[in-house]
C-alpha cells in the first residue's frame, strides 16, 4: 500500500474482521539490561486486535524500554516477540515500521526545519515520472490525511513554527499514515488541551473499529478509565499483571504500580505569611500578553492556570529574561529590576524549569553530572581550574535528595526515564539556591509516585521560605498545590483566586474568557 492509500484507509471505517490469531502482538519473557541496571526482567505483554492496552508504571519501571524493543530501537538480551503469532526480530525501527508497528514517542521526533508534509512522508516521498519528489502530490496526500483526522494545519507549515500540541498532532498523523496494525502511544496527551485529548480519543476509537491494537502509555488515571480496555502494570523492570480496566479503580491501580499505598497526594500546608519578594505591575509582551500584575511572597506557591496559548509560559519566560518585556514594572525586594537575559535573572535569585525538557532543558549528549552542574559551574571555576570534587559531591547530594535513579553520574542523561530527567533538571536549578523558583509543567510525563515526591519537595521548599510560581495544565495539581491561582486567557490576566475560592469550575470559567 502506498503512502496515500494508507492515509485514505481512514476514510471509510468498515467493521474489523476477526483475525485467526488471538493476539496482534506478544512479548514473551523479554529481558534487557544496561550497565549497572536491569531495565526488564522476563516481562510479558499481549495486545489484542481492536483494543487499547494501557501500560502503567512509575518512572523507571521499564515501560519505555520495552516499547523501544518492540519498535526496533533496542534489541532484547533474551526473550521473544511475536507478531500475529509469528516470531519476529527488528534490527531497526524501519524494520518494525515495515512489519506494521508504529510508535509515537513521548519526546517528539520531528524535523523543525521541514514542513508538515515532508515530516510525515520522509523516506516515502511521492515521485513523479522523472523520479523527482512530487511536492504537489505530497501536499495533496497530507491535506487528505489531516482532514480525515480532523487536524486543521497547513501541510506546508514548518514544524518549527508549531506549538508543542500541534507537533504532537503531526506525530499522531505520521504514525497513522503507516496504516500499522499496532500503534504505540507514549504519553500522547502530555502537551495537548482537553479538547485535543477528546479529538485524539475519537481517532483511537476509529482505529479500534478497524481492528488496530493500541498500546497506550500514560500516567493519567482518568485517561486509563476513559479509553483503555485492559491495563498492564510494570514495576522496577518486572511485569506485575494485566487486568480489565473496568475491574480496577484508582486506588487498586496505584497500589499495583507502586507496591504500596500512597499517602495524600498533595501535602497539607498552612498558608504562609512571608515578606513580599516580587511585585509585577502591567507586564506586557507586545502581541503575546498584556496587563499582567501580581505579588509574590516568600513561602508562597502561586499557580498560573490557563488553556494552551493563554500566555502562561510567555510570562514565565519574560520574568526569566528569555524574552524581555516591552513594558510594565518588575520590583524585587522593593527595588525596580530590569531582567534582560537569564544570566541576570539567575544573579537575582530566579530559576526556571522549562516546559519542554528536550527542546530547552537537556543537553542530551552529555552526562547526568554535566547536565546538573551547568548552572553553577562558574561558581566552582577559577584560575583555569574546576573544583570537580566539590561539584561531584554537590550533584551526588542532590541526586539523593531528589531520588534521581541513574547507574552513575557519568550516565548519558538521554538514557534516563523522562521523570528522572526532569528531577535532574530540577536539581540543576536548586543548586543555584534560588529565592524564586518558576516551574512550567513540573510533572509533565511523570508517574503518580514521582508526582507525590515532586509535590512534597515543592511544599518543603515553600516551607523553607522559597517563593514558587507553578504553571500547570492539570487543574487538580494547580488547585492542590497553590495558595493563590492566577488565571489567563489569550494573553490577559482574567483574575487571581485565593485557595478557598479556586474551584475547577471557576478556573475553567476564567480560562475560557468568562468573568
UniProtKB/Swiss-Prot annotation:
Residue sites binding ATP per the record: 57-64
Give the UniProt keywords, A-Z: ATP-binding, Cell inner membrane, Cell membrane, Membrane, Nucleotide-binding, Repeat, Sugar transport, Translocase, Transport
Record membrane topology: Peripheral membrane protein
Q: Which residues form the ABC transporter domain?
A: 25-261, 268-515
Cellular component annotations (GO), alphabetically ordered: plasma membrane
> Might you give the EC number(s) for this enzyme?
7.5.2.11, 7.5.2.7
Catalytic EC class: translocase
Cellular location of this protein?
Cell inner membrane
Q: Gene3D superfamilies from the entry?
A: P-loop containing nucleotide triphosphate hydrolases
In alphabetical order, the GO MF annotations are: ABC-type D-ribose transporter activity; ATP binding; ATP hydrolysis activity
Q: What catalytic activity does the UniProt entry give for this protein?
A: D-ribose(out) + ATP + H2O = D-ribose(in) + ADP + phosphate + H(+); D-galactose(out) + ATP + H2O = D-galactose(in) + ADP + phosphate + H(+)
* Role, per record: Part of an ABC transporter complex involved in carbohydrate import. Could be involved in ribose, galactose and/or methyl galactoside import. Responsible for energy coupling to the transport system.
The family classification in the record reads: Belongs to the ABC transporter superfamily. Carbohydrate importer 2 (CUT2) (TC 3.A.1.2) family.
Output the PANTHER family linked to this UniProt entry: CARBOHYDRATE TRANSPORT ATP-BINDING PROTEIN MG119-RELATED, GALACTOSE_METHYL GALACTOSIDE IMPORT ATP-BINDING PROTEIN MGLA
- Protein name (Swiss-Prot/TrEMBL): Putative ribose/galactose/methyl galactoside import ATP-binding protein
Question: What taxonomic ancestry is recorded?
Answer: Bacteria, Pseudomonadati, Pseudomonadota, Gammaproteobacteria, Pseudomonadales
Amino acid at each position: 500500500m502506498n503512502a496515500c492509500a494508507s492515509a485514505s484507509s481512514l476514510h471509510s471505517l468498515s467493521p474489523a474482521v476477526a483475525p485467526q490469531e488471538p493476539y496482534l502482538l506478544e512479548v514473551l519473557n523479554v529481558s534487557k539490561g544496561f550497565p549497572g541496571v536491569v531495565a526488564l526482567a522476563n516481562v510479558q505483554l499481549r495486545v489484542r486486535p481492536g483494543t487499547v492496552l494501557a501500560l502503567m508504571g512509575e518512572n523507571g519501571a521499564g515501560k519505555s524500554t520495552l516499547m523501544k524493543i518492540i519498535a526496533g530501537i533496542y534489541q532484547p538480551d533474551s526473550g521473544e516477540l511475536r507478531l500475529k503469532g509469528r516470531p519476529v526480530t527488528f534490527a531497526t525501527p524501519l524494520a518494525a515500521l515495515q512489519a506494521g508497528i508504529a510508535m509515537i514517542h513521548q519526546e517528539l521526533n520531528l524535523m523543525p526545519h521541514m514542513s508538515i508534509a515532508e515530516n510525515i512522508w520522509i523516506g516515502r516521498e511521492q515521485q513523479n515520472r522523472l523520479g523527482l519528489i512530487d511536492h504537489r502530490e505530497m501536499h495533496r496526500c497530507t491535506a487528505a490525511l489531516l482532514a480525515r483526522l480532523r487536524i486543521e494545519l497547513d501541510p506546508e507549515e514548518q514544524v518549527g513554527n508549531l506549538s508543542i500540541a500541534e507537533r504532537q498532532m503531526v506525530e499522531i498523523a505520521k504514525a497513522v499514515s503507516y496504516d500499522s496494525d499496532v500503534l504505540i502511544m507514549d504519553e500522547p496527551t502530555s502537551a495537548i488541551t482537553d479538547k485535543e485529548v477528546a479529538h485524539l480519543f475519537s481517532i483511537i476509537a476509529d482505529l479500534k473499529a478497524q481492528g488496530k491494537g493500541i498500546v497506550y502509555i500514560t500516567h493519567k488515571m482518568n485517561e486509563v478509565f476513559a479509553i483503555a480496555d485492559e491495563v498492564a502494570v510494570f514495576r522496577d523492570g518486572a511485569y506485575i499483571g494485566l487486568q480489565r480496566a473496568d475491574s480496577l479503580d484508582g486506588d487498586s491501580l496505584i497500589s499495583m504500580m507502586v507496591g504500596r499505598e500512597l499517602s495524600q497526594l498533595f501535602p497539607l500546608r498552612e498558608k504562609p505569611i512571608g515578606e513580599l519578594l516580587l511585585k509585577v505591575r502591567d507586564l506586557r509582551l507586545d502581541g503575546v500578553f498584556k496587563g499582567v500584575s501580581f505579588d509574590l511572597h516568600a513561602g508562597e506557591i502561586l499557580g498560573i492556570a490557563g488553556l494552551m496559548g493563554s500566555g502562561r509560559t510567555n510570562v514565565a519566560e519574560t520574568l526569566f529574561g528569555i524574552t524581555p518585556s516591552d513594558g510594565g514594572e518588575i520590583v524585587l525586594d522593593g527595588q525596580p529590576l530590569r531582567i534582560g537575559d537569564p544570566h541576570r535573572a539567575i544573579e537575582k535569585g530566579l530559576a526556571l524549569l522549562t516546559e519542554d525538557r528536550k527542546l530547552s532543558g537537556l543537553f542530551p549528549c552529555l552526562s547526568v553530572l554535566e547536565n546538573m552542574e551547568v548552572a553553577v559551574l562558574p561558581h566552582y571555576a577559577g584560575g583555569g581550574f574546576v573544583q570537580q570534587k566539590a561539584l561531584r559531591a554537590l550533584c551526588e547530594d542532590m541526586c539523593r535528595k531528589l531520588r534521581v535513579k541513574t547507574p552513575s553520574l557519568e550516565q548519558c542523561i538521554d538514557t534516563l526515564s523522562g521523570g528522572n530527567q526532569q528531577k535532574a533538571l530540577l536539581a540543576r536549578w536548586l543548586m543555584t539556591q534560588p529565592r524564586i523558583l518558576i516551574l512550567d509543567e513540573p510533572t509533565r510525563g511523570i508517574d503518580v509516585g514521582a508526582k507525590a515526591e515532586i509535590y512534597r519537595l515543592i511544599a518543603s521548599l515553600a516551607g523553607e521560605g522559597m517563593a514558587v510560581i507553578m504553571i500547570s495544565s492539570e487543574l487538580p495539581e494547580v488547585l492542590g498545590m497553590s495558595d493563590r491561582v492566577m488565571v489567563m486567557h489569550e494573553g490577559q490576566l482574567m483574575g487571581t483566586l485565593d485557595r478557598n475560592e479556586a474551584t475547577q469550575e471557576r478556573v475553567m470559567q476564567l480560562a475560557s474568557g468568562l468573568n
